[in-house]
């Protein structure tokens, strides 16, 4: 997929995506606004079971509109199970979304409240599929754990990730990123909301069981500024910082949001 045909500007941003990706107007698009009064507590939802092996952290890559921290997903060493999931899902990468000011940047909102950013830990169904690229378009293919981020005290767990951004400042750069436990980025409570949705950027496949943590994590204004220092331009090109990379909430279209709490 060419990443140049979409972005977050006025010409190629979320409002324009449906021209190239008609599913953008589909019935199961993400993110959404989570209305807490309409989220149904479901006592059949299990607790999340998260088991991440820090040794599976592999590299950090500037993908142009964001950066990905990539994990070795060749075996079930870092997995998400339980919760709403019938199968075991293998961690393949995590990434962040942010905005051009501290009062917005998250993709999901809660009762209309926008957060400063959002962490997405992307997992694929290794019980049914042989790779992330096979699973990405299947209805039960992906599970994404979403964590809302609120501006506040600095987050020491996040700093190792942010410090690595200097080595991948421009689009296409990659660098080793090893021995990192992403569970250090999760809130202490794993109460969650869950619903069926999509990738939040092209190709926008409706293949995601979303699990959104009820509690947010904090990061400082300085840490947010480090995220915005990432460049979407390649080396040697005029510098274009990634100031904003979030899609606004999409219509629920009759879907149910369930709460574990």
Curated annotation (Swiss-Prot):
Disulfide bonds: none
Active site feature: 65
Compartment(s) where it occurs, according to its Swiss-Prot or TrEMBL record: Cytoplasm
GO molecular function list: arylesterase activity; carbonate dehydratase activity; cyanamide hydratase activity; zinc ion binding
Reactions listed under catalytic activity: hydrogencarbonate + H(+) = CO2 + H2O; urea = cyanamide + H2O
Binding residues annotated for Zn(2+), in chain numbering: 95, 97, 120
Any coiled-coil regions, as ranges: none
EC number: 4.2.1.1, 4.2.1.69
Region (Disordered): 239-261
GO CC term, one of those recorded: cytoplasm
Cofactor requirement: Zn(2+)
InterPro entries: CA_dom, CA_dom_sf, Carbonic_anhydrase_a-class, Carbonic_anhydrase_a-class_CS
Residues modified as N-acetylalanine: 2
Family: Belongs to the alpha-carbonic anhydrase family.
Record's function text: Catalyzes the reversible hydration of carbon dioxide. Can hydrate cyanamide to urea.
Name of the featured protein: Carbonic anhydrase 1
């Amino acid at each position: 997929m060419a990443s140049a045909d979409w972005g977050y500007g006025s010409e190629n941003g979320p409002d324009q995506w449906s021209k190239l990706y008609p599913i953008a107007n589909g019935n199961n698009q993400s993110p959404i606004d989570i209305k807490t009064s309409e989220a149904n507590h479901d006592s059949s939802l299990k607790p999340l079971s998260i088991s991440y092996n820090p040794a599976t952290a592999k590299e950090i890559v500037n993908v142009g509109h964001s950066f990905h921290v990539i994990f070795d997903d060749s075996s079930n060493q870092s997995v998400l199970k339980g919760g709403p999931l019938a199968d075991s899902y293998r961690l393949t990468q995590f990434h962040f979304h942010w905005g051009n000011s501290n009062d917005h940047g998250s993709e999901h909102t809660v009762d209309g409240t926008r957060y400063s950013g959002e962490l997405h830990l992307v997992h694929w169904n290794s019980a049914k599929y042989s790779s992330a690229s096979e699973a990405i378009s299947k209805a039960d293919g992906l599970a994404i754990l979403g964590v809302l981020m609120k501006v506040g005290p600095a987050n020491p767990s996040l700093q190792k990730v942010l410090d690595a951004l200097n080595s991948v400042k421009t689009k296409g750069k990659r660098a080793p990123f090893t021995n990192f436990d992403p569970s250090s980025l999760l809130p202490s409570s794993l109460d969650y909301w869950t619903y069926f949705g999509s990738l939040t950027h092209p190709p926008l496949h409706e293949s995601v069981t979303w699990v959104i943590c009820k509690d947010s994590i904090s990061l400082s204004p300085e840490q947010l500024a480090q995220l915005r220092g990432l460049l979407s331009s390649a080396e040697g090109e005029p510098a274009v910082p990634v100031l904003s990379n979030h899609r606004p909430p999409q219509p629920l279209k009759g879907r149910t949001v369930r709460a574990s709490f």
